[in-house]
């Protein structure tokens, strides 16, 4: 466990932060601050999809909104409750500022991921549409090297998300329900595994139906619950924002911050937790965006950016503000326990119940999203028939995860997750000219024609 933890530290402190932030800066400049120019278009398509007649997902793909809902299902997970709290506890309030920077730059990266996933999506002999980094990795690196790199990425994502990642998510639900309601973790594990398997075997249509229903409900529930706590402590809001901005550059100047926080700690923890949460550049969400039914790849690029904004600037931000306005950092707690404490300052024991319900929605939706990403790679490596075996194995991992000691599993998932960033981001760098061309084509030809 110590060795894997050390590998993760090296990856995040030196390699991934440079790759992901560097990629974000390159794509932001190359695409002319697309985060700002495409912001309105992204929200227009998102809300248009939310309130319009729902499309039916099938072998030809899913609607743009269903693809976003599946991506957000994966992005908004337990990290939004525990990850922000951990960053605050270790890096202090300034970590949130660096989360914002990482998310802003990440919006440009995920735009590139989504449009490449759309451009290189694959239609099988049976008419099923699939896609993801494996296809644009092969487009970026021709021949045997591209095939090997794509296969390595596939194996990493199947283990990181489909097996180990989902085990961690189910453990979060089981432990939260045990704390709040006293239900044995094995009982919770069986229930989650059965429900998950029911969704898995329903294929793309059932996954799309579940995510487009569950994501708006869970987002609204958490947003309202958080805003009530924040506004109950409204006098602390100005200082919370002050501590975030000042703490990013001078952590010692902020009272109520983390003991021993430095600028380096604030930056590394903020960037790492932010990127880990919104998944920009990780190569996970392109699987959902690839199967969206859109007229031009750039349209889904706009929608993908909205996902990062919702994950970080809304959900993660609310967790941070709840913790800061309730002055919970000096308690010495960390992770989900810190978030739980912050909510309980207003809700009492109801805070545990609130977090348990949110944990269920966030973690279960992530299980579905990550399964979907994993099965696309199982299909790529072993063919469509292997998906049935994978769905059963994934459900077994969901059950076992509810009982496991998760530190080792979490660290291994972290490690595989970190490693899969490298082939994905290198492929995006190699395809940066193509990304730029597709982007220019939309604004020059397609957008004017509409």
What is the role of each PLM region?
Residues 1-74, 78, 89-95, 106, ...:
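N-terminal alpha-helical transmembrane segments of multi-pass membrane transport
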Residues 27-28, 102-127, 134, 138-171, ...:
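Helix-loop-helix module between adjacent transmembrane segments
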Residues 54-90, 116-119, 125-134, 138-140, ...:
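Alpha-helical membrane segments and immediately flanking helix-loop junctions
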């Amino acid at each position: 466990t110590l060795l894997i933890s050390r590998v993760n530290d090296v990856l995040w402190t030196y390699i991934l932060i440079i790759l992901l932030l560097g990629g974000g800066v390159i794509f932001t400049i190359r695409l002319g601050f697309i985060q700002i120019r495409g912001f309105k278009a992204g929200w227009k398509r998102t809300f248009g999809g939310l309130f319009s007649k729902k499309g039916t997902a099938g072998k030809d793909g899913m609607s743009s909104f269903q693809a976003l809902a599946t991506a957000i299902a994966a992005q908004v997970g337990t990290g939004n409750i525990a990850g922000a709290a951990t960053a605050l506890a270790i890096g202090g309030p300034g970590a949130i500022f660096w989360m914002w920077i990482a998310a802003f730059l990440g919006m440009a990266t995920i735009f590139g991921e989504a449009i490449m996933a759309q451009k290189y999506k694959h239609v099988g002999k049976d008419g099923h549409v699939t896609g993801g980094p494996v296809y644009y990795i092969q487009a970026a690196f021709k021949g045997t090297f591209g095939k090997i790199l794509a296969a390595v990425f596939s194996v990493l994502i199947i283990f990181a998300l489909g097996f180990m990642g989902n085990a961690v998510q189910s453990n979060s639900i089981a432990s939260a329900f045990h704390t709040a309601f006293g239900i044995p973790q094995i009982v919770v594990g069986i229930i989650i595994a059965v429900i998950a398997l029911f969704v898995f075997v329903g294929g793309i249509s059932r996954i799309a139906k579940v995510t487009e229903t569950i994501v708006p409900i869970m987002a609204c529930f958490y947003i309202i619950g958080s805003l009530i706590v924040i506004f109950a402590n409204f006098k602390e809001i100005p200082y919370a924002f002050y501590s975030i901005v000042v703490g990013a550059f001078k952590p010692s100047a902020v009272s109520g911050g983390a003991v021993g926080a430095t600028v380096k700690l604030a930056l590394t923890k903020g960037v790492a937790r932010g990127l880990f949460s919104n998944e920009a550049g990780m190569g996970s969400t392109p699987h959902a965006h690839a199967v969206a039914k859109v007229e031009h790849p750039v349209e889904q690029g706009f929608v993908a950016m909205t996902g990062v904004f919702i994950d970080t600037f809304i959900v993660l931000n609310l967790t941070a503000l709840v913790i800061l306005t309730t002055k919970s950092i000096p308690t010495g707690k960390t992770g989900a326990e810190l978030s739980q404490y912050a909510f309980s300052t207003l809700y009492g024991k109801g805070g545990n119940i609130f977090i348990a319900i949110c944990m269920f929605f966030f973690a279960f939706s992530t299980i579905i999203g990550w399964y979907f990403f994993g099965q696309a790679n199982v299909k790529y490596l072993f063919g469509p028939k292997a998906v049935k075996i994978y769905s059963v194995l994934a459900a077994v991992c969901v059950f076992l995860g509810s009982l496991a000691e998760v530190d080792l599993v979490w660290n291994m998932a972290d490690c595989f997750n970190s490693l899969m960033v490298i082939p994905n981001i290198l492929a995006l760098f190699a395809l940066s000219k193509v990304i730029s061309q597709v982007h220019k084509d939309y604004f020059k030809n397609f957008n004017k024609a509409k």
